[in-house]
Amino acid sequence: MPPLEVSVLRDDGSLAQKSSAELRELGRLPHPMLRRHGEAGFSQISWDDALELATAKIAASSPERLGFYLTSRGMPNEGYYGAQKAVRALGSANIDNAARVCHTPSTVVLKSTIGVAASTCSYSDWIASDVIVFIGSNVANNQPVATQYLHHSIQRGAKVVSVNTYIEPGMERYWIPSIPESAVFGTRLTDRFYQINTGGDAAFLSGVLKHILHNGLEDSAFIAAHTSGLEELRASLEATTWETLEAQSGSTQLEMQNLGQLLGEAKSAVLVWSMGVTQHATGEDNVRAIVNIASARGFVGREGCGLMSIRGHSGVQGGAEMGADSSALPSGKAVNEQNAALLEAQYGFPIPSSAD
């Protein structure tokens, strides 16, 4: 994108008439711009002046009145880490980033179930997997680099399943530029689509797990060694009728049983989800249903297996791990007096021990 001609900002009244597309076409800001009280528009200032102005405003504000927000696209880990350290040095805990809005349900559920708020596998595990299930996720559009791994997994014979409210065209067939054969003829990415209601994820996945448990397809050894609460979950699923699950999911008993049988017979599987799962009032329930299936089948901690909360931007996971979050310190540690004291010993200045 070319640099913006700063003269167009001297009177910003004309900008109000432009569409968002027209505003983007103006280009990127090449210099700091300032609009002073009473002026019709913005004028260019130096970087030194911009930094001095921002510094003075921050210094004049009390810590509880400060707030810092970091976006994720293009932000490296070092930027996240340095920002959270600077904000906490100011005595504030008011730092946030775009990743929290996207995957908070994943963070909460993964931390409370498996102990780590991150994916348990990598793209290379797709290649070694028998089944790859995408739930509310469209990698062809949102993570196109990942499709080359998907292509190789398909070549090995993996079954690819999509659970979504919409049959995404890119998930039907995609042309992968880095693979000559695919670039010419395209690659069929998905073997089977399961369409569900908006908000029907948890019900559909509960039906899948209901079939697995009812037919004895669970991994009993893994469950005994690594999980708890199976019998309570089994009783809850048995008490839920197929009619209820059909009404809530928008799918059919046969389709839920079909996917349950596929996963029940698979030796390995990766469950992948994205915004289509988390951006709901029931986001945590949706993610928990995914974790329950993986736990019941032992699809965690082995090659070709895993839970993958796939991210949309290059720097998103860094925001979660580097502590650019009012409720988490670096490495994802909770904000409390004990963890704050450990960080204080390293940094040499007081760390706010509350996220409020």
Where are these regions (language model features)?
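Long, contiguous juxta-domain segments that are non-catalytic but functionally important
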Residues: M1-S19
